Amino acid sequence: SSAASDVYKRQAENGTRSIRFSVTDQRGYQRIVDWQIVASDIAVQTVAIPDDKKYLIWATKATLFGEVLPEREPQSELSFRYRKVGTTEWQTVPAVRNGSVLTAEVTGLKNSDNELFSEYEYQVMEGAMASNVKCQFTTEKTLQLENCGFEEWSGSKPMYIAASSSDFFWDSGNHGSSSVSAFATDLTTADSSVKVEGKYSAKLQSKKIVIKFAAGNLFIGKYLDTQKMNGILGWGRSFTSRPVALTGYIRYTSGTVDNGGKYIENGEQDKGQVFIALGDWEGQTYGGETWPLIVDTRDAATFFDPKGDNVIAYGEQTWDSSTEGENMHPFVIRLNYSLERIPTSIVVVASASKYGDYFEGSTGSSMWLDNLKLVYDESELEE
């Protein structure tokens, strides 16, 4: 037979093949080499989203990756196709080329039915031909805040913003205002007369407790201790998703400041504030408990700094005067993400007197909050 008939030409199916060569010499020494061989009819290949770029996967958008294969040059238009895992219909988006790296941002991603996330798969395309490599990613969860409609309450002096005093997500200064038994009072309470839906809203009322001014407040976390009528607070809870806004409903009554000082003077109108922050704080410990942040109202150096190194996103809204009428009004606090990191914790704080940390404000100020919601899809804010 001819020499040619001894040579077999193998036509590999498109894909990545692993070949392992193992060679052992006469002395028993062994060497193993692994090769990755890419069989492809096109000049591009899909690439998984790199570990150091996981921050490019959000709840409703993600950046897809591909590459131009070495010593190959695409001859047709480059794009990506993507779909939810388990569905049949692909969507297509143009690829952006930077050297050999291909990317595309896809938006409008939706959760799977009855899930807080979804799984997507994608392939890079050259013309009408898809790369043989298919990659997947899972979107961030569209988590919501617990008891965000403030329907669950228990106890009195202190009143808890939860069904049980042993398991709560929110807390308030009620522990401090109830610590002097003869003058015990709750600053933050359930109110059935002002609400958007359900049974209650949260009412935050600023008051004078004995000789000290106390702002009506609530926050994600736990009131840890009272030291000489000063509160020590653990702020924040674990949270790894990235909403684009906090929305809710508010009614605010701004009193005339009667406990003025350095930050707001007597006779001025008091200010109410709600703020939200996401960060990767290392954690601080008090009394054996570790919290993302610990605020000691005796020490201004412990107060929250929105420009702190570990703040990944921050948004706030201040009300300089009373809201109109007796109804609640919608508000939107957008979040600006400044860092290419994924948070570990979330902080939300509301105060009927913005400068309550400094014991300044008005005993005539009250704030009602209801139906807080974390928004993940920008298009919801445009409606």
Identify the function of each model-found stretch.
Residues 42-44, 134-179, 383:
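Extracellular carbohydrate-recognition regions
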Residues 15-19, 116-122, 344-346:
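Exposed beta-strand face motif in extracellular beta-rich ectodomains
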Residues 3-8:
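Short, small-residue-biased leader/transition segments that mark boundaries at the very start
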Residues 24-29, 127-129:
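Short, solvent-exposed loop/turn segments at the edges of extracellular beta-sandwich modules
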Residues 10-16, 106-118:
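Surface-exposed, short loops/turns at beta-strand junctions within beta-sandwich domains
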